[in-house]
């Protein structure tokens, strides 16, 4: 809404996409090819296949230097979860065993397979992270 109000013509409205789908809308590969993808609070409230699809498609769609930005809570290796995130993770897994906080190392490994470099991690309020992956030049 703010982008439309401010006349930011280079920001499209949010798209409803099945992240796990084999194919994404053809328009994303043509007139609406993204320079960045911003995904907020999705990969922990979806099956792992959704994270895999998001990273795979982002790797195909984004140009070198393009950004994939993920926002939300993550597990961080062997670090214990904060009590609030531990309770949230348990609640998610109780509602659906395919849901839950994802390990950042596993997400980064998927990103590397899709052609992204090491993530830049920004600590955010409420034990969330902004994780920025940049697409690397083709090898």
Where are these regions (language model features)?
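Short alpha-helix
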Residues: 3, 97-115
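Conserved Class I S-adenosyl-L-methionine
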Residues: 81-105
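Core SAM-dependent methyltransferase catalytic element
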Residues: 114-139
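A short, conserved alpha-helix within the catalytic core of class I
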Residues: 45-61
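Class I SAM-dependent methyltransferase SAM/SAH-binding core
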Residues: 1-26
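Conserved beta-strand signature within the Rossmann-like core of class I S-adenosyl-L-methionine
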Residues: 62-77
């Amino acid at each position: 809404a703010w982008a439309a109000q401010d006349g930011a013509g280079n920001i499209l409205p949010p798209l409803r996409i099945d992240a796990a789908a084999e194919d994404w809308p053809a328009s994303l590969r043509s007139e609406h090819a993204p320079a960045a993808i911003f995904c907020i609070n999705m990969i922990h409230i979806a099956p792992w296949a959704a994270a895999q699809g998001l990273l795979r498609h982002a790797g195909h769609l984004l140009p070198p230097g393009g950004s994939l930005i993920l926002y939300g809570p993550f597990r961080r290796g062997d670090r214990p979860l904060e009590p609030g995130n531990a309770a949230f993770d348990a609640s998610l897994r109780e509602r659906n065993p395919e849901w839950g906080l994802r390990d950042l190392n596993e997400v980064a490994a998927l990103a590397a397979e899709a052609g992204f470099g090491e993530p830049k991690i920004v600590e955010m309020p409420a034990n969330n992270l902004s994780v920025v992956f940049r697409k690397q030049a083709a090898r």
